[in-house]
Design a protein with these regions (language model features):
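Terminal targeting signals and extreme-terminal segments of soluble enzymes
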Residues: 1-284
Length: 284
């Protein structure tokens, strides 16, 4: 398949002075997908940075919900450009409404210590009663589940998602979300990094609820990501299998945290992600 809608969502139009317009990706009146906004914000920051440096971190704070059918404008501030590093600040708007504030860090790749942990598949205890399937390290052997609920921003014809949950309803809950973009993509590490941010925000706070036996799809809680942070360790290939291994170490006061490692198919950690979000019980 040739590059599809997801890649086109990251084709921003520069309107001058490090200001960019990003296309919408959904019906008017529906809530904009946070991963869409975060990925476009990172793409805007990348457009203002030299091609010799790659993103090392992106931090996005979601301030207001957006409209999925409305284009967004991203204003980038060049905070710092050093010999090997750069820093950018990004503000995201729809009209005059400020939707997000973020920062992105960049660096020229250099030599230094290199190590990685591996996904914790070897210690996982399968809960076949809950999942109906044994855990496997081969994503092709898992059923093609798609996201855990409706996700119009991630069309099934473009993104293959296979979710395997373990120990639901306990503090040891683990979500293993295998994903890949089913499209021909150019060898552009910036595009692949932005696509990783785009895809991995899907139901990003759900592990917070899953620890307690709930889900973002059951209507028991108002849940939404308020802060998304990603540290990029190595180049990501969005068009190959990637494993997002998610846990929730803490929740209190109506908020919770999801931490995750993003691994390539060989088990090497390519990124680390932390999402914070609201998880407020609905009054029946």
């Amino acid at each position: 398949m040739t590059a599809g809608g997801l890649a086109r969502m990251l084709e921003l139009v520069e309107i001058g002075d490090d200001s960019f317009i990003g296309p919408p990706n959904g019906p008017a009146g529906k809530r904009a997908y946070g991963g869409h906004l975060a990925a476009q914000a990172l793409a805007a920051a990348c457009r203002s940075t030299g091609s010799d440096r790659v993103p090392t971190a992106a931090h996005i704070q979601f301030l207001r919900g957006g409209d999925a059918g409305v284009q967004s404008r991203y204003q980038v501030e060049r905070v710092h450009d050093g010999r090997t590093t750069s820093s950018r600040r990004i503000l995201g708007f729809q009209g005059d409404r400020l939707l997000l504030s973020g920062t992105a860090l960049f660096a020229v790749p250099t030599t230094g210590p290199a190590h990685t942990d591996t996904a914790h598949t070897d210690t996982a205890q399968t809960d076949t009663a809950q999942t109906g399937t044994a855990h496997t390290e081969d994503p092709d052997a898992l059923p093609r589940t798609g996201p855990i609920g409706p996700a119009p921003a991630l069309p099934a014809v473009e993104v293959d998602i296979r979710v395997h949950d373990e120990r639901s309803g306990t503090a040891e809950f683990v979500r293993r979300l295998w994903w890949r973009v089913i499209a021909d993509l150019p060898d552009d590490p910036v595009l692949h990094a932005c696509l990783a941010v785009y895809v991995t925000d899907i139901y990003g706070i759900d592990p917070v609820l899953a620890v307690h036996g709930h889900s973002m799809t059951d209507g028991s809680h108002h849940a939404a990501t308020t802060d998304s942070s990603t540290w990029f360790h190595r180049d990501i290939r969005a068009d190959r299998w990637n494993l997002l291994e998610c846990r929730s170490p803490a929740a209190a006061r109506g908020r919770g945290v999801m931490t995750a490692g993003l691994y390539d198919a060989s088990g090497v950690r390519v990124a680390t992600m932390v999402h914070e979000g609201q998880a407020v019980k609905r009054e029946r």
